[in-house]
């Protein structure tokens, strides 16, 4: 296979000088890969390797003609031939007349290749075995039959002549002999082995085959055949385009790679360490030579065939050991590493040497905290700095004339003479270094700092950057890298300095937020004192900050004393200040706390926990910009540490106060549980209901005890000081409510490793100590937690890698692509609570359409293509606008990457994204980085995790008129009504019939308000049984059971504990459908109800019932509901676009449901639309629970059965925009559960990449085939081209690819090969003759170029400033200095 850099003509002299200056990268702009012809291989080669020997064991010199021969591959020593006749550089390029070695540098042994002339052709295993087999596609044979030919089991007919044999027909030995006897020896040609395959390929006329295949394509209607034909077409057209011949896939000449790439190293004791490739080559040469000799000796066919097969197998092992048959093993039964293994996997050439390299000028050491540092500094041990900055020191020593040679300078440095230390100080001043902490999960894991030289061995880190690095000081290590070139230093100073990374790129929240001690100090200063002054009690009035500080220093006042000071914000607008009062009543601590913040914030007169500190920092940045914020942060750090130290807060066991009420609460719960057990014993409720009720009771109890605990801690039993446990928890410095509850209250319910909840809660707290049984129960959860953590870290890393790979090439390509399409954003509700407001979702995006003020329609709030600022977003939210369409990466039409407007504001900078920003990588990191925090939460409900119990009622949020929509009701005896279907909704409308609220109504809900009645805000609209899903009857009458066969469709179980018999519907294979029929007195059926699997039947046959009676009930699985798949696996499942196990059936059209019996053991459900006369039928497995009933009106995309939604179906039925909504909301839900904020735009970028392919449904006049997947941008461009030429454009449907698939489908074969399935990607690319245009990141890193993003964009890279000779550079007016160059 040959890979050629496609050369760009460049005059070589100019290139050499520029190359020497390090300006010009190697001059090529694309790389192509094709199948190499035998001529090409011979052209690469410098000679044939005939001898399997490597080096002479006595002289250690390479054997002539062997695998290390100097004549073929070049001299072992620089400028010295093998026999020693010519030595030194003066004989450069002379070929020695005695030993035939060219006198040159030894480095040529890394690039010169040899070759082996094979005695018989040999098939290349990649083209034979890599599925789909390329040889098979070309010859239209199966891989299996090809193998029989290539490994000399069968003959293949190549030219049938006049005989009735078919071309490419396989013949066994006996059949071959019979054919010869029958037709004569010369009447047809049949051969064995790769030779037969080569001859068949030589005879293939590619052009004619293409024409024939296209004809067949037109003729056939079968999708199966079309699929097969388009596969063959693709490969054959690939060969035509790349001007390669298919017979080149069978090798006649084998290339030998340069010897220095498969070295042989002598070890002590006379043994050698060798690369496995030498062994594999040696086998090939041995077998090849033996075969040659045998063929000259007129040996019997059997022996020759065997020898030929062995040669084929030897070459297979060399290319891809283990692909065919048993792998060839070396010493200790270890499979040898073949050429393919050299490329594959983490240790392969791509990932080990091309994408990740070891770096010079770097070191690593343990980190410790550096509270004395400024934000832009880090402490670097002098010993490390001396080594890292050595070249700079040497240069400076020479400049200052201390030494004249590099050796002298090195000696001076080794002696550590005093001048060296001074020069080190000078050299490191203003020269930033990069600090990196593994795992590098997002871009903030590498930041630049100015080094401050320190004694000792450990690197010192500023405490505020610990959050970004996720570092702590329990032995973490960090690596230091020194940027060398001027450009690198500038980028570090301007872009990577810790001071310019205040905000998190994933959510735009400050990431430099203080934690632990600093938070504790700040909270301690601002906390509300215990004693409130009485109503008319006088409080000292001081003149301001200075006087307060005097009073504190004097000991006259304490930090928590009330004091009155003049209000600095009187009469001016500030963010937190009070504009009205002239005198503020506050505490001494708060006066001190306020001195560090900028005046525009106003006087902060409330306690400041961690979350409020974040707000203060955000607002400081808005008011004063970057530099002032950085200075404020440093002041906050100083103040926090000092205060925390002076406060001397520590916790003792007595501070964990156990509430007295705990006993009574537990006793009360036990009483309630006894009642539940009694109900169960009488048989009123089922086992499942009993369990759920008990668990709900205990969850409620735990919450009540927790409330008591917090109340107790807050009041601190009437002591004067604030409880230290409470301070730590409330300030957010350490510990959360859950942990404190377990210390002082109860541990609560625990989960088994399977995720089920154990019914008996742990009632003791850690303060009281656990009993043996309780301790044992709690070990379950703890151990599972540890095992999960270990397993999940690898998964999170892998997810990040896949996301990076798929989104890598998304950069901002232009400022505006001109498209004004977009996606709708609306607020997110959970139940009745708004969790994410519309404002949060649209701020920082560009609006697609004009947004009008609903109250005054002539006013445009924001125009189309304009930025939605915070002010506008707040306005939109306040005016009650439901949804806004914003521009999105999903709808951007930019050719490569996306445009700045569709991305909006870059969360890390707060400014609109610039051309060249690598937003794809940022998106992948933002989603992957929190992945490590997403524990595999096995229990979302119960466990020590959380108790999620939704109240079984709907309260309305707005007053208005009730309107029923699509509800089927039945009146009950007491005049209320009960809902019978799952698909109905109730709307609340205002006087103008404008919809205010919509509620989905649960089946079995009891409605309190009639259709068209008025309802007040907060009134209860509907209630339902939280434990069961009922099956209710619409009609009254006598009951008859159908298909209820004990032991087949239903089982009667005796409930041990309650002693009653229950009838439950069970899973069944037969064509049966358990139903309850309702008949009128004459025995005519009025209605029939299918009873789902798992339901308990609540009536007996022959009963006479009223409308609305309960026929059966299915327990709602409450205790494991949320845990379908949680956390990380769920995110991976969504991004991989996997089809769920039992996906819900979705209606494909709007229409009315009807059932039409059973077909092949499945129920047939038909949706008919009378207006359009469409009908769609669905076959539904009997075990599945159908949630619609005959006669229901369903909408397109509505679920007909229970189950999870399938993203592919959503795309197919409802189109892309519904899919966007689905995926964004599902991914966000997982992260929200963990309290992680991620901006929607990151998820949108990944989804854009998953949807970038379309599948051709009709090729029209384009060159595409039916069923081919092509890039959306390519597809549109090709169609435009065809339309301009007046042809028929192609048609296609969007398809959703999982991120792994999408990564492998990139345009660039280099990028795909370095991701996964290397051999398959390269095989594919070479047969299609692909050309890599080096547009993306990975391929450029691999080729050693700058990446085409940020400062590496061609438009910046090739920037030239032209000025008349002697002119000065234009000087920009003075700007305030950026924070990065802040003086210490």
UniProtKB/Swiss-Prot annotation:
It catalyses: RNA(n) + a ribonucleoside 5'-triphosphate = RNA(n+1) + diphosphate. Its EC number is 2.7.7.6. Mg(2+) binds at residues 472, 474, 476. The keyword Transit peptide does not apply. GO terms for biological process: DNA-templated transcription. It comes from the Bacteria. Gene3D superfamilies: 1.10.132.30, 1.10.150.390, 1.10.1790.20, 1.10.40.90, 2.40.40.20, 2.40.50.100, RNA polymerase II, clamp domain, RNA polymerase Rpb1, domain 3. The keyword Zinc applies. NCBIfam families: rpoC_TIGR. Belongs to the RNA polymerase beta' chain family. DNA-dependent RNA polymerase catalyzes the transcription of DNA into RNA using the four ribonucleoside triphosphates as substrates. This is DNA-directed RNA polymerase subunit beta'. The lineage of its organism: Bacteria, Pseudomonadati, Verrucomicrobiota, Opitutia, Opitutales. The gene is rpoC.
